[in-house]
Each structure stands twice: as structure tokens, then as C-alpha cells.
């Protein structure tokens, strides 16, 4: 069996597992199946790229478990169409690429320059042109291009940053893990109404902490 066909089968098995775990949005499953996760991990770990597990990417960061990527993306899409999305924590760029397949424009912020440089090279290699990226403190978001219909935060702050809430459009939603860096956190959906924010807890998760400068 060739490498290409082997990876295609691995992706199919991953999609089947995600479906069994409750991911139902066909658009989310399609873009995950079409996105080569092995491109976003170290070559030494590429044989594990389609396992449903988080993997290290250096700098004490990880590429998230595919189920969590799918769960967060599905939760974000449930709020409606996404013309502009803000991602806090580019990391390997895998979640960014998934969002780019489903949104008009993705603005992503990463504080670790080498990770961002690697991610941008991957976007170029894959021909993804609807991502705008910068190296900065993710706690501040990217207000110049807000408000956003969706905000996805890929690391866990102790509490929801007011700076990010301000960048959420009315009717938009934020998907964010919240809690102390040790142990598990709560994955939350925050929806902005005309005069308030509605919050809902999805499930328990474990993310690296969101660190400010």
C-alpha cells in the first residue's frame, strides 16, 4: 500500500471515529478529511498524525486532539455563517487551516514567532490564501479587523478576557476553554446579544494555558 492510500485510509478511520464520538456537521467532517494533519506535525510524529490524540509541536505547545478541533469548530459554526473569524493561538496552524476551509477570512494571532513562521509556511504549501496572521499577545486579539462573527481560542485563560469579548460581533460566538492551567478546564460558548453575553459550558477539556506578555 502506498503512502498516499495509507494516509487516505487513516483519515477515513479518523472521520469515522469523530462521527462515532458525536461530530455530525458534514462540512466540518469534510474539511477535516481533506486537511493533511501530517503536514502540521514533526516528521518524526507523522505516523501518528491521524490518531485522535494531541501531539507535541515544541515550545511546550501541542496540536490539539482532532475531536477537540472538530468539537470547537462545530460549536463555532452552529452560530451561523462566518465571514470573519479570529483565532487566538495559531500553534501548528492545523486548527487555522480547518477554519479557513469554512470561513471567509481567518485572522490568527500567535505569540511564539517560530511556531507562526512554520504555520505560515504550511499555509503557503497548501495554497491557503484566506488566512491573515501576526505575532502578538493573543490576549489582545486583533481589534483592527473586528468585530468577528466567530472567535476561537486555542489556549486556556483563567477567565474570559474582556478584550476578546469586545471584539465579538452582536450575534457572534466565541468558543474558549476557561480555567486554571493545572488539571482540566471548561470549554465554553459565549454568544453576544444586543446588550449582554450568554454563556454555556460544553464539556471538560485540557488545554495549555493562554499566556500574556
Swiss-Prot record:
CDD domains linked: AdoMet_MTases
Entries under SUPFAM superfamilies matching the protein: S-adenosyl-L-methionine-dependent methyltransferases
Principal localisation: cytoplasm
Gene3D superfamilies for this protein: Vaccinia Virus protein VP39
Residues at the catalytic site: 64
GO cellular component, one term: cytoplasm
Alphabetized UniProt keyword annotations: Cytoplasm, Methyltransferase, S-adenosyl-L-methionine, Transferase
Chemical reaction(s) catalysed: [protein]-L-isoaspartate + S-adenosyl-L-methionine = [protein]-L-isoaspartate alpha-methyl ester + S-adenosyl-L-homocysteine
Family (UniProt): Belongs to the methyltransferase superfamily. L-isoaspartyl/D-aspartyl protein methyltransferase family.
Chain's role: Catalyzes the methyl esterification of L-isoaspartyl residues in peptides and proteins that result from spontaneous decomposition of normal L-aspartyl and L-asparaginyl residues. It plays a role in the repair and/or degradation of damaged proteins.
Protein name (record): Protein-L-isoaspartate O-methyltransferase 1
Gene that encodes it: pcm1
Amino acid at each position: 500500500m502506498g503512502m498516499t492510500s495509507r494516509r487516505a485510509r487513516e483519515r477515513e478511520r479518523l472521520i469515522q471515529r469523530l462521527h462515532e464520538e458525536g461530530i455530525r456537521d458534514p462540512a466540518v467532517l469534510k474539511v477535516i478529511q481533506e486537511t493533511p494533519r501530517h503536514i502540521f506535525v514533526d516528521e518524526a510524529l507523522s505516523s501518528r498524525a491521524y490518531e485522535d490524540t494531541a501531539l507535541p509541536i515544541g515550545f511546550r505547545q501541542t496540536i490539539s486532539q482532532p475531536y477537540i478541533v472538530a468539537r470547537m469548530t462545530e460549536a463555532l459554526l452552529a452560530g451561523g455563517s462566518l465571514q470573519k473569524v479570529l483565532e487566538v493561538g495559531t500553534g501548528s496552524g492545523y486548527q487555522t487551516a480547518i477554519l479557513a476551509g469554512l470561513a471567509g477570512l481567518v485572522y490568527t494571532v500567535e505569540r511564539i514567532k517560530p511556531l507562526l513562521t512554520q504555520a505560515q509556511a504550511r499555509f503557503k504549501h497548501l495554497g491557503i490564501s484566506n488566512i491573515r496572521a501576526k505575532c502578538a499577545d493573543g490576549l489582545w486579539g486583533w481589534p483592527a479587523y473586528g468585530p468577528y462573527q466567530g472567535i476561537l481560542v486555542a489556549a486556556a485563560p483563567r477567565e474570559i478576557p474582556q478584550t476578546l469579548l469586545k471584539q465579538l460581533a452582536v450575534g457572534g460566538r466565541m468558543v474558549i476553554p476557561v480555567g486554571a492551567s493545572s488539571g482540566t478546564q471548561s470549554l465554553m460558548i459565549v454568544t453576544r446579544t444586543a446588550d449582554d453575553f450568554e454563556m454555556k459550558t460544553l464539556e471538560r477539556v485540557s488545554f495549555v494555558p493562554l499566556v500574556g506578555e
